[in-house]
Amino acid sequence: GVIVGAVGSTGLSTNLILVIESIAGDNVIILIALTILLCLLLGMGLPTTANYVVVASLMSMVLVDVGNASGYIFPIIAVHLFVFYFGLMADVTPPVGLASYAAAGISGGDPLKTGIQAIWYSLRTGVLPIVFLFNHELLLIGVENFWHALLVIITSLIGILVFSAATQAWF
């Protein structure tokens, strides 16, 4: 679309990559945090698909290369899921969180409080893609047999249930 073409033709993509790489250096954690920030910022004005296309084209190979240089192996599918999930998070995070503000309008609640509550409930959606980067077994990469896959699925389900219960104050 128009945004993707504008980012590519104006040279913004190369400048943005250079700025992010110079800030992060070889630090993978800072690079991941800056990629999250970029996803959330672009998500304020772009639909999810366009956000994914722009950020994936800008940052996916940077994350893979810096991860490899730092001793981490980030599968390309994990990086793409990471970018996609944080593109989805832009819909619930203030100040633009369109889904949160629409819910507040329907319920008659305060938009900012609804946005903050939406972030709290979506924490698992924010943690999961980071786990994808560092634990490839969640994507069934490197799983050797059926029992190993079953163990990964069961422990993942238990973990997400406990995490969700904690954010819902069931403990």
Language-model features: where?
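Alpha-helical transmembrane segments of multi-pass membrane transport proteins
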Residues: G1-F171
